[in-house]
Amino acid sequence: MLALGKLLELTLAGREPAEKTQLTVEGVRMRWMGEGALEVRPPEARDNGTDLLLSAGIHGNETAPIELLDELIRSIARGDLKPRARILFLFGNPDAMRRGARFVEQDVNRLFNGRHLQSGGAEALRACELERLAASFFSLPERYRLHYDLHTAIRGSTIEQFALYPWKEGRQHSRLELARLRAAGMSAVLLQNKPSIVFSAYTYDQLGAEAFTLELGKARPFGQNQQVNLGPLRVCLEQLIEGTEPERDDDLEGLQLFSVAREVIKRTDAFTFNLADDVENFSPLEKGYVLAEDAGGSRWVVEEEGARIIFPNPRVKNGLRAGILIVPTDADSLG
């Protein structure tokens, strides 16, 4: 196997490869772009016009998707996978990966769409570098651009695998992309309705990619992800890489769709959730329930029918989102 197939091993060791560019026996070029970054380019005659960005490890302790990307990279380096797409593999936060931590000082996935310019430190610099790598990769005109940013969650979920679809003014969410997500094993998709500062929102908003944050189960240490079922996603990614996707219609039967009702913002250190510490994502909330409280008598009361909570985290920094209230929606407004 080519040495660049060991990108994860190099990244965890903090080492650069001796050779920055290598070719497989099929003529696929693998090029080391920097720490945790590998570009894969098929021979020109096999290139099908797809640019696929696959990122994981934005949170360093979310190891199942990191291991999945490692397996795909190794398969390409061995010649088992024969790409027809250009691919950029990114391990988002190498320092946190080496520590087995979500982040070191700052959550990298709150530093995109220019937010890193308002901050400092190594993780702000890393977010800037990830934006640069993505922008360079997606700079070729007239190509199909797709980005999957792969995560696992810090808590359990009543819907284990789901996606978040970013928003941009004047741009419709795609039924065909949602159908692909369903085939990849996603049971639900949250359709966002405002700008965001996560990685997939940057590539969607600024670079014109179809982009998604995929939540794939519970976060566990390296080597302990046997319970995370990534089989359907892996098949989907292999098909995208090799250009062998079957034709599929835009039938969304069985895919649950949600929209954002409100974001819960933590204003002060007095903020508290009236939820159990182990509450799961997508837990239902009764209308009239006092969800959260903050200083000055501020209260978050559930007003929506069918509301659920995702990503509740009272320990975020003041001014950041501490949770999202979501409600069921349908596919009537999709493109």
UniProtKB/Swiss-Prot annotation:
<dbReference type="GO" id="GO:0019545">
    <property type="term" value="P:arginine catabolic process to succinate"/>
</dbReference>
<dbReference type="GO" id="GO:0008270">
    <property type="term" value="F:zinc ion binding"/>
</dbReference>
<keyword id="KW-0862">Zinc</keyword>
<comment type="function">
    <text>Transforms N(2)-succinylglutamate into succinate and glutamate.</text>
</comment>
<dbReference type="InterPro" id="IPR050178">
    <property type="entry name" value="AspA/AstE_fam"/>
</dbReference>
<dbReference type="GO" id="GO:0009017">
    <property type="term" value="F:succinylglutamate desuccinylase activity"/>
</dbReference>
<keyword id="KW-0056">Arginine metabolism</keyword>
<feature type="active site">
    <location>
        <position position="215"/>
    </location>
</feature>
<dbReference type="InterPro" id="IPR016681">
    <property type="entry name" value="SuccinylGlu_desuccinylase"/>
</dbReference>
<dbReference type="Pfam" id="PF24827">
    <property type="entry name" value="AstE_AspA_cat"/>
</dbReference>
<dbReference type="GO" id="GO:0016788">
    <property type="term" value="F:hydrolase activity, acting on ester bonds"/>
</dbReference>
<comment type="similarity">
    <text>Belongs to the AspA/AstE family. Succinylglutamate desuccinylase subfamily.</text>
</comment>
<feature type="binding site">
    <location>
        <position position="151"/>
    </location>
    <ligand>
        <name>Zn(2+)</name>
    </ligand>
</feature>
<keyword id="KW-0378">Hydrolase</keyword>
<dbReference type="GO" id="GO:0019544">
    <property type="term" value="P:arginine catabolic process to glutamate"/>
</dbReference>
<feature type="binding site">
    <location>
        <position position="59"/>
    </location>
    <ligand>
        <name>Zn(2+)</name>
    </ligand>
</feature>
<feature type="binding site">
    <location>
        <position position="62"/>
    </location>
    <ligand>
        <name>Zn(2+)</name>
    </ligand>
</feature>
<keyword id="KW-0479">Metal-binding</keyword>
<comment type="pathway">
    <text>Amino-acid degradation; L-arginine degradation via AST pathway; L-glutamate and succinate from L-arginine: step 5/5.</text>
</comment>
<dbReference type="InterPro" id="IPR055438">
    <property type="entry name" value="AstE_AspA_cat"/>
</dbReference>
<protein>
    <recommendedName>
        <fullName>Succinylglutamate desuccinylase</fullName>
        <ecNumber>3.5.1.96</ecNumber>
    </recommendedName>
</protein>
<dbReference type="InterPro" id="IPR007036">
    <property type="entry name" value="Aste_AspA_hybrid_dom"/>
</dbReference>
<dbReference type="Pfam" id="PF04952">
    <property type="entry name" value="AstE_AspA_hybrid"/>
</dbReference>
